[in-house]
């Protein structure tokens, strides 16, 4: 998903380091990246727009590496885990996803479910955490808007 500007990528298993780096929305195009397993460090680095979902299926540990959202100034990251993300950069806010948040990504989760034969009950069996840029984010002022 490097510098992705639109479209969807669905990964059944794991992804490596710097997954989703430099993703950015462009006009009506919103990139979507879904990882069924876990990711390495620097997930969503410099994320400027779009949606990243990490499901951590068959994972007991937190399914993302270190430095999640470093340089993030747009977009959203959803991480499925019963363990809250820790050691996030100051420009990233984390909240436990509410029903309204899940309803926004439900069609993407259903698409993943259909593609890979993973039951929605399994996907929804753990909590999701929603990561967004901090409104007081010092990075946003360094970038131009679309």
Predicted regions and their residues:
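Long, distal/terminal scaffolding or interaction modules
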Residues: 1-146
């Amino acid at each position: 998903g490097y510098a992705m500007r639109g479209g969807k990528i669905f990964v059944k298993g794991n992804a490596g380091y710097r997954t989703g780096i430099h993703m950015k929305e462009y006009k009506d195009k919103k990139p979507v990246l879904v990882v069924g397993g876990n990711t390495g460090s620097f997930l969503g680095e410099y994320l400027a727009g779009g949606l990243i979902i990490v499901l951590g299926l068959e994972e007991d540990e937190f399914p993302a590496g270190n430095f999640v959202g470093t340089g993030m100034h747009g977009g959203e990251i959803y991480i499925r885990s019963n363990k809250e993300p820790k050691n996030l950069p100051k420009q990233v806010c984390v909240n436990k996803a509410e029903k309204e948040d899940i309803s926004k990504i439900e069609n993407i989760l259903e698409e993943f479910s259909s593609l890979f034969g993973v039951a929605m009950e399994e996907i929804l069996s753990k909590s999701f955490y929603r990561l967004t840029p901090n409104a007081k984010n010092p990075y946003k002022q360094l970038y131009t808007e679309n």
